[in-house]
Amino acid sequence: ASRGLGDVYKRQMICGFGDTHPNYLNTTPVVRMIENAQVNGKEEQERYFTALLKCLDPDAGKAAAKKNVRVSINSFFDDKPLTLKPDIRAGKIEDYVSPLFYAPNVSWLVQRNGMHPRHSLMISLNASEGNHMHANGISMELYGKGYVLGPDAGIGLYLYSGLDYAEYYSQFPSHNTVCVDGISSYPVMKSNHSFDLLSCFPASSAAAAAKDKFPSVTYSDVYFREPESRADQTRMMSIVTTGPETGYYVDIFRSRKERGGDKMHDYFYHNLGQEMTLTAADGTDLHLQPTEELAFAGAHLGAYSYLFDKKCARTGKDVKAVFTIRMPDKDIHPNIILI
């Protein structure tokens, strides 16, 4: 699955794209780097990854309580217990991340405005380059208030054996993306459909210590060629920080078929929450009506038939969506304005 150390978010949750499930960061690769450094006498590497491991896992290296049990024969083949140097202090998570990072080998880009566990914001963008990928175009996840607010659907409940994986979870409508004329798709699993990074601020970089390293504004602009409909798509995303505890996202998605004849460009967005209200931006009622327009029977992807409780309205006004995430302490209300 498309996960890695660089995908860590504030609560050490991994970013999700392709065949993933939401989960916490696995520190085994960090342990392997420490063991490699100890065997080969790489002191600088050992110090770097030991500090990282102690940052991610404060209990790392602490001796486990001895148990009065028989010694397993597997102990002859297991790795020796990891011993960490006590003089190496835990690093700070800010030392291992950057405001913007782009990994073209998997067509993945992340941008953030800090690492505060509650108030910082982050955007994750991905296309489909490599193995275990989905047909998702320029897909995104949004992070805020310490949660994955706009999650990627991942692999689904029944993994590869389920029909829902082939028809829905691996297809455009299950992702936060734009589907053209209801037909956007391409081969999944091993895929070679990446996006091009046109421009960004700040420049993509590995972590580097710097004063005021998180600017008040970050942005990225990427291009993707959707092969099924022969559409050119660009997505410009930005995080604007307005205060120590406040900020907002900007998402400008442009989509146009090369030869014209555009019918519809469906903007899909999935947010956490138990409730959602949809009104005009000025608060007036849109008079939503039930519809079955978005369905497989309309010559669209089968994934459209997985949508339920569908409603529609025709309007020339800006639209406002308010999601309610009910929490034990304080509810979260993501607001989205569609212009």
Model regions: which residues?
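Flexible domain-boundary/linker segments
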Residues: M13-I14, T20-H21, L163, F195, ...
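Acidic Ser/Thr-enriched surface turn/capping motif at secondary-structure junctions
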Residues: K10-E35
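Short, small-residue-biased leader/transition segments that mark boundaries at the very start
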Residues: A1, L5-Y9
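Polysaccharide-binding surfaces and accessory modules of carbohydrate-active proteins
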Residues: F268-L338
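Catalytic and substrate-binding regions of extracellular carbohydrate-active enzymes
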Residues: Q38-V39, E46-E292
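Short linear sequence elements within intrinsically disordered, low-complexity coil regions
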Residues: P22, L53-K54, P81-L82, C200, ...
